[in-house]
């Protein structure tokens, strides 16, 4: 698994070579990654080489070749943008792009996919294709598979979730009453709401009086994941 800085450098080298035909210089890499010394770039390149993503060609200046890319980013690498969080709202911890959380020596960073945009009701296809990636300190999420979604409405505003926030979701198919979930309705429509189990029915509650509460038979609802946090960029 790549750290956030390793991923960022690999992406930068690939795109630079695609645009210019030559690898970037160490100074260009240092500037792009906002590092203060070339030694940090040397360590990142060594780590990428050891993991089989790049190789250095001997006796040639600026001779770095990208051998392969992580599978999750090869589909749309030229337009992908890595997002670093500014605020993680579930524990109010602030992170800056230059924070030690994203330093080369920090080995507990992970990259999760942003799988589309979610609203009160969208087709399932809206969250089935990765549109971006998100770099997070690993200690901010729990065990399991995670993904992110961009919020596109104000249906959960009274729960502190705003339009354009990015929500972090742990993939799971069960939930406790009162938790905010991603739900698939009738295998066609996806929504994110507060989950309530009441007898032989499931209630999905918005956190905005302008949106209706929906009640379903259990067989119509499939839980796709549970909200564990959100990121808000200022």
From Swiss-Prot:
GO terms for biological process: DNA repair; DNA replication; negative regulation of DNA-templated transcription; proteolysis; SOS response. It comes from the Bacteria. Its EC number is 3.4.21.88. It is an enzyme of class 3 (hydrolase). The keyword DNA repair applies. Pfam families: LexA_DNA_bind (PF01726), Peptidase_S24 (PF00717). Represses a number of genes involved in the response to DNA damage (SOS response), including recA and lexA. In the presence of single-stranded DNA, RecA interacts with LexA causing an autocatalytic cleavage which disrupts the DNA-binding part of LexA, leading to derepression of the SOS regulon and eventually DNA repair. This is LexA repressor. It comes from Bartonella henselae (strain ATCC 49882 / DSM 28221 / CCUG 30454 / Houston 1). The gene is lexA.
